[in-house]
A protein has these predicted regions:
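Conserved two-metal-ion catalytic palm core of "right-hand" nucleic acid polymerases
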Residues: 2-248
């Protein structure tokens, strides 16, 4: 049980807690949750999700009580209770994404511009058909984020280890990477305060690698065709029934 947060030394926790195998919730220790909490909080910071930040602020008002309650529920492996802790009635938010205006053909033929953005907006509200787009974003509880980080610390890092160097997105922080790729010595970095590598670093590497490949192909007098795809609402259109498929 956690007695007093202000006396926790996270550096000592990391040296005492190496990456270990998951043997069941009954073997869970409070230090496992503290490390997972630290990573979850840092990961949320980089996402810049205001709603999630507010949840963490409220969680820390009674931190010791909240973390101990979660610890006890996990130790009992009470699945129904765990799910109720992780998902509440505010588990998603509709964030405004864009406003599109479809104006009539006659108006599109007029070559004029209004210098005031506010007046131009008022005119479009009056004369054009409006389509408002939003994006569904997860707004999970702090307990859900802790459980996610806990899963990564115990199990998820093993899946990440099997990915090739050609997988750039959302890779975990590791030690002793060789040319950005996992080796037998590149263990999951439990001591790092975040779970994932900063997005912009692998993105830049992915971009540069692609451009270099194109340049080399052109230098070799080869024909090159480059496709850059952004699938619209991909995750929102996945059929969750695939989970029930034995092949999956």
């Amino acid at each position: 049980m956690l007695k007093c947060l202000k006396y926790i030394n996270f550096n000592e926790l990391f040296w005492a807690k190496m990456v270990k195998k998951f043997k069941g919730f009954e073997d869970l220790e409070i230090t496992d949750l503290l490390i997972a909490y630290r990573k979850a909080k840092a990961d949320i910071f980089w996402e810049k999700n205001i709603s999630a930040v507010e949840r963490f602020i409220n969680f820390e008002i009674n931190f010791e009580s909240n973390i101990n309650d979660l610890f006890e529920v996990l130790k009992k492996a009470d699945v129904e209770k765990i799910v109720s802790y992780c998902i509440d009635n505010e588990f998603y938010i509709n964030y405004p994404k864009s406003i599109d205006f479809e104006c009539n053909d006659e108006e599109s033929k007029d070559f004029y511009s209004i210098s005031s953005p506010a007046k131009e907006f008022e005119r479009k509200l009056k004369d054009c058909e409006i389509t408002i787009s939003s994006r569904i974003v997860g707004n999970f509880t702090v307990q859900a984020h802790i459980l996610s980080a806990l899963w990564i610390n115990f199990i998820g890092h093993k899946y990440d280890e099997k990915l090739s160097k050609n997988s750039y997105g959302s890779r975990l922080n590791r030690l002793n990477l060789e040319n950005g790729c996992c080796t037998n010595e590149s263990k999951y970095n439990l001591e790092k305060n975040t779970s994932f590598q900063p997005y912009f670093i692998p993105y830049k590497e992915w971009q540069s690698t692609g451009l270099n490949a194109v340049e080399k192909a052109l230098e070799a007098k080869k024909n090159v065709m480059v496709f850059s795809l952004d699938l619209k609402s991909y995750y929102h259109n996945i059929d969750v029934e695939i989970i029930n498929n034995d092949d999956f």
